[in-house]
Curated annotation (Swiss-Prot):
This is Phosphomethylpyrimidine synthase. Pfam families: ThiC-associated, ThiC_Rad_SAM. Residues 45-54 have a biased composition (Polar residues). The lineage of its organism: Bacteria, Pseudomonadati, Pseudomonadota, Gammaproteobacteria, Methylococcales. Belongs to the ThiC family. The keyword tRNA processing does not apply. It is an enzyme of class 4 (lyase). The keyword Protease does not apply. Substrate binds at N229, M258, Y287, H323, S343, R344, G345, D384, G385, L386, R387, E423, Y450. Gene3D superfamilies: 6.10.250.620, Radical SAM ThiC family, central domain. Pathway: Cofactor biosynthesis; thiamine diphosphate biosynthesis. Binds 1 [4Fe-4S] cluster per subunit. The cluster is coordinated with 3 cysteines and an exchangeable S-adenosyl-L-methionine.
């Protein structure tokens, strides 16, 4: 728990240096779009020159996707008490289909606003909420289906291309991929983005009340994304700690963040997070609704849930996990499972269904929920409340019965032009993972798949970021669009900052491995650049090009801490005499000096060694 008194909260909520410090040799750059206010951020990684016999060879910079927002831009000063600039506000206003409200329209939002006891916790600079004008639909899917390319779509297209046109010839080589039916173009255009969103194959989570967000896209024909979970609980964390966690997550590469808070002051905590987040924020609204009935699932009502949806939509939540696929007939299917129902949201709704012996209000009021979603452009993340919690329960009838229902609900949401992604498992052994992707594509009509792992074995508590990253890489290759990270603390406790970092890096590896396997254009460029740096013993460039430069440097310095070791032409694994890359370089130098190609140099070198062996007496072992 934080020891900071509430009355000085606003002074306490400041960004820690470690969360906003740019990576070494990295610079925030912006690619200009078609309008002055459309500037797309990238991270430019500079490299050192390669020494050659004739001078120095320039190594071009590498451009990479950047999720850290303006925080890592040293030219921008961000005050967390004021929040981020409303990047998308002019775009939203220009469309002319929304209106500003005088204040919150949810009962709970009004109650919190009028409570004087919360003044010290409240984010001070709250904008009036915005809502669609009567009869209007303000979703990105609706615009896409009208043939409109929004600034958000253009922003996404520029961002996904990662400045491929500037890619050096040295880094362009890429192995052909196997995309399992995905249709990934060589260049992502705004029109392609529009078409994918219109078809429902991709979503751009972009609530009109979260204008601070930098547009991003989730779909299998785009880069694989990762989500990071954070949130307080009844026994831990504070507002300032949750904001800090969000900053930490996006620095290391979180594409979206889910606030799963279940403790005190959920409403106020969420406001602080959204106002300072450049990435989409997701929630599970049933968690907060449950708090409103003191944790008694059977006392939940549609009215309480509806008010919670409006409350969160008007704060700016970009996507809601809603477990509308849990139906009363499916609950008995879990009776013989090894681990039953492991989803929190799933167990809440199962308990409600059994207590009332009828279908859940999430299912029966689904079209009413769609009406709310399209008034704010909140995307559905249709929850997998019956996901397997052990590999023994993988791919059972309960799991797939719910999945088929999610496909039916997707059709209903699309009828309202509401954006949808589908949540997936869970715990699945490797040989059963592909079937999950195939079933999802078959029954959910190519809506983006968003999976928790899956974990490929149950025997590694403390290492579930690894057991799940294996499954995540596989299912990402097969077509999953976003991977929900798992930390080493999964099943054991609440993650700290180091656990969050470890989980994110494990999932960045999984997502990138999937992009490589799919053959996503330009995915291999960073690998090629790092491999070249490794071969040329450019140690600092190796560190800087890695997903975790600080860890790479730390590990190197544990063995070779001297500054001179960073210029050494060998590594700590093999030493100076057995380094395979150094030997290869020696062969190339020999070839150059004697006017030979590499094959001739190897043959000539072997011949010289043979002569030396014979001259020394042709003895295998020499007396010393």
């Amino acid at each position: 728990m934080s020891a900071i008194p509430q009355e000085i909260l606003h002074e306490a909520v400041t960004a820690k240096k470690a969360s906003i410090q740019p990576f070494a040799a990295s610079e925030k750059v912006y690619l200009q779009g078609s309008r002055p206010d459309l500037r797309v951020p990238m991270r430019k990684i500079s490299q050192s020159d390669t020494p050659t016999n004739t001078g120095r060879e320039k190594n071009p910079p590498v451009y990479v996707y950047d999720t850290s927002g303006p925080y890592t831009d040293p030219t921008v000063s961000v005050d967390l008490r004021l929040g981020l600039p409303p990047l998308r506000e002019p775009w939203i206003e220009e469309r002319g289909d929304t209106e500003l409200l005088k204040g919150p329209s949810s009962s709970y939002g009004l109650q919190r606003q009028r409570d004087p006891a919360l003044a010290s916790l409240r984010f001070e600079h709250i904008r009036a909420p915005r809502r669609a004008k009567g009869g209007a639909n303000v979703t990105q899917m609706h615009y896409a289906r009208q043939g409109i390319i929004t600034p958000e779509m253009e922003f996404v297209a520029i961002r996904e291309n990662q400045k491929l046109e500037a890619l050096a010839e040295t880094y362009k080589f890429q192995h052909p991929g196997e995309a399992f039916g995905a249709a990934i173009p060589q260049v992502i255009t705004p029109e392609f983005v529009r078409d994918e969103v219109a078809r429902g194959r991709a979503i751009i989570p972009s609530n009109i009340n979260h204008p601070e967000s930098e547009p991003m896209i989730i779909g299998r024909n785009f880069l694989v994304k990762i989500n990071c979970n954070l949130g307080n609980s009844a026994v831990s964390s504070s507002i300032e700690e949750e904001v800090e966690k969000m900053l930490w997550a996006i620095r290391w590469g979180g594409d979206t963040v889910m606030d799963l808070s279940t403790g005190k002051n959920i409403h106020e905590t969420r406001e602080w997070i959204i106002r300072n987040s450049p990435v989409p924020i997701g929630t599970v609204p049933i968690y907060q609704a449950l708090e409103k009935v003191d944790g008694k699932a059977e006392e939940l009502t549609w009215e309480i849930f509806r008010d919670t949806l409006i409350e969160q939509a008007e704060q700016g939540v970009d996507y809601f996990t809603i477990h509308a696929g849990i139906r009363l007939p499916f609950i008995p299917l879990t009776a013989k499972r090894t681990t039953g129902i492991v989803s929190r949201g799933g167990s809440i709704m199962a308990k409600w269904c059994l207590a009332h012996h009828k279908e859940s209000f999430l299912y029966t009021h689904f079209e009413d929920i769609c009406e709310i979603m399209k008034a704010y452009d909140v995307a559905f993340s249709l929850g997998d409340g019956l996901r397997p919690g052990s590999i023994a329960d993988a791919n059972d009838e309960a799991q797939f019965a719910e999945l088929r229902t999610l496909g039916e609900l997707t059709r209903i949401a699309w009828k309202h032009d509401v954006q949808v992604m589908i949540e997936g498992p869970g715990h699945v052994p490797m040989h059963m993972i592909k079937a999950n992707m195939e079933e999802q594509l078959k029954h959910c009509h190519e809506a983006p798949f968003y999976t928790l792992g899956p974990l490929t074995t149950d025997i590694a508590p403390g290492y579930d970021h690894i057991t799940s990253a294996i499954g995540a890489a596989m299912i990402g290759w097969y077509g999953t669009a976003m991977l929900c990270y798992v930390t080493p603390k999964e099943h054991l406790g609440l993650p700290n900052k180091q656990d969050v970092r470890d989980g994110i890096i494990a999932y960045k590896i999984a997502a990138h491995a999937a992009d490589l396997a799919k053959g996503h254009p330009g995915a291999q460029a960073r690998d090629n650049a790092l491999s070249k740096a490794r071969f040329e013993f450019r140690w600092q460039d190796q560190f800087n090009l890695s997903l975790d430069p600080e860890k790479a440097l730390e590990f190197h310095d544990e063995t070779l801490p001297q500054e001179g070791a960073k210029q050494a032409h060998f590594c700590s694994m093999c030493g100076p005499h057995f380094c395979s890359m150094k030997i290869t370089q020696d062969v190339r130098d020999y070839a150059r000096e004697h006017g030979l190609d590499e094959a001739q140099a190897l043959a000539k070198g072997m011949e010289e060694k043979s002569d030396e062996f014979v001259r020394s007496g042709a003895e295998v072992y020499q007396r010393t």
